Amino acid sequence: MANWETVVVNTDLLICGGGFSACGAATEASYWAKKKGLKVTLVDKAALDRSGAVAMGLSAINQYVGLRDGENTLEDYIRYVRSDLMGISREDLVYNIARHVDSTVHLFEKWGLKIWKDEKGKYVHEGRWQLMINGESYKVIIAEAAKNAIAAAGGEIFERVFIVDPLMDGNKCVGAVGFSTRENKFYVFKAKAVIAGMGGAVHVFRPRSVGEGFGRSWYPPFNSGSSAYFTIKAGAEMTCQEVRFIPVRFKDAYGPVGAWFLLFKSRAISAGGGDYMVVRKAELENWKPYGLVKPIPANLRNYLGMLDTEKGLGPLYMETDEAIKNIAAQFKDDPKAFKKKMKELESEAWEDFLDMTISQAILWAAQNLKPEEKHSEIAACEPYFIGSHSGAS
């Protein structure tokens, strides 16, 4: 049996995890730690540049209030979250996140994130609260900021170290233990404060992907519920972590639908029932007041599609071809401009996947599917336990 070396690391702040939340915590904490002479240590079970839920990239930022230009107020955003989650929300926490998010986005842009802008230099919105980005390297940019901040403060980063248990002193978490996935080393991290940012939990429920596709999921398959385990073990409050998130995505490869619904204004239909948002509109009356707000809560939109599926009217489709043609129609009297716009929209459709879900682009290519010519199947994913998209906090 291999002889394992025990490595003891002493620090003031221990950050467990290496995704977006951990990198953000490291960047902010290091700023203050440097002034106070404190040490920050970050431990990632993967490699910081491409770890976490944003490892493959993103094609949009899904929360931007627009305070600088007076687009919305914090109260507007609170009302939106309350409506979308049908009243199940911790509004104090939502408010606290919302008041900081714009300045964070501006930092991302300063660090090198490409945010779409129009001819007037204004951000291009996907929807009221979303910004379009070229985000294939999103995580790399944020990881670089965290690395620089930790280095400047004299802290440490440990990669390929799998944290398995918190260290408890009574009811206080004072560190964590874990092992290297590359070397025969067992780590004992001793800290005065610990941040658990290790993602949510996937594969708790049976995945839709089976056979050769087994293991493919919308949420990263590497997220094994470590944050929940740490929280429970340490006796900390679990706010909204019980929320099960069921996103609708393009079937099989889990490509994003946000740009299609919000930017391209696409419709979703069922094979045998048509536009279920129109046909089943009366069902929304049963969910007042939330069924009557605009935009209609995401879970109710999904529910109406699932009703069609349960009645044997499925599968569901995203009308990509119709959406692209509708946008290009404004140039129908100018064949040259029409052709140019069609190519531009086709490029944006593919880029949406290449920025954040490359597997969906590969699937389209493998099927020789052209979004401007044929619609694509969409489906609800299996449920996930996930921090950020619980939305309620």
Residues covered by each model-derived region:
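Mobile, glycine/GP-rich and aromatic-enriched active-site lid/loop segments adjacent to catalytic centers
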Residues: 102, 109-164, 169, 241-393
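Glycine-rich active-site loop/strand segments that organize a redox cofactor
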Residues: 61-97
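N-terminal Rossmann-like FAD-binding beta1-loop-alpha1 element of flavoenzymes
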Residues: 13-41
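Core beta-strand elements of the Rossmann-like FAD/NAD(P) dinucleotide-binding domain
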Residues: 8-11, 182-193
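Glycine-rich FAD pyrophosphate-binding loop
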Residues: 32-56
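Short, well-ordered coil/turn residues at beta-beta hairpins
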Residues: 17, 191-193, 197-198
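Glycine-rich loop(s) and the adjacent beta-strand/alpha-helix scaffold that form part
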Residues: 196-256
